[in-house]
Amino acid sequence: MARIAGVDIPREKRVEIALTYIYGIGLTRSRQILAKTGINPDTRTRDLTDAEVAALRTVVEGEYQVEGDLRRQEAMNIKRLIDIGTYRGRRHRLGLPVRGQRTRTNARTRKGVRKTVAGKKKAPAKK
């Protein structure tokens, strides 16, 4: 198993797909990296030579922000929004959708499990 940016890349998958297991690398960026290193996207990870793995590691770790660094930067960006008190920061703090989606219905993923609110009780019947 090749290890790039602290992630074990799956051996049986094509390199193009295997690189997407690294946080911060999608299919497009994976193709850019392979073009830069001159590696055929259709080769399997198990067939890569040590030199090719080293070239991939150099490009990924040198030119792109991935894994822990990227997660840390995203967390800091959200924390900055919260600290300066922007609308987006308040939405993050309250755990509500940030990008203008409706919340009267839907937004269940962001709001969490539905909390039932008791309905109004009927008055007792008079005799």
From Swiss-Prot:
Subunit and partners: Part of the 30S ribosomal subunit. Forms a loose heterodimer with protein S19. Forms two bridges to the 50S subunit in the 70S ribosome.
One CC-aspect GO term: cytosol
Stretches for region Disordered: 100-127
UniProt function note: Located at the top of the head of the 30S subunit, it contacts several helices of the 16S rRNA. In the 70S ribosome it contacts the 23S rRNA (bridge B1a) and protein L5 of the 50S subunit (bridge B1b), connecting the 2 subunits; these bridges are implicated in subunit movement. Contacts the tRNAs in the A and P-sites.
UniProt keyword list: Ribonucleoprotein, Ribosomal protein, RNA-binding, rRNA-binding, tRNA-binding
Matches recorded under Pfam families: Ribosomal_S13 (PF00416)
Descriptive protein name: Small ribosomal subunit protein uS13
Annotated organism of origin: Synechococcus sp. (strain JA-2-3B'a(2-13)) (Cyanobacteria bacterium Yellowstone B-Prime)
Biological-process GO terms, alphabetical: translation
GO molecular function: rRNA binding; structural constituent of ribosome; tRNA binding
Biased amino acid composition, Basic residues: 101-127
Family designation: Belongs to the universal ribosomal protein uS13 family.
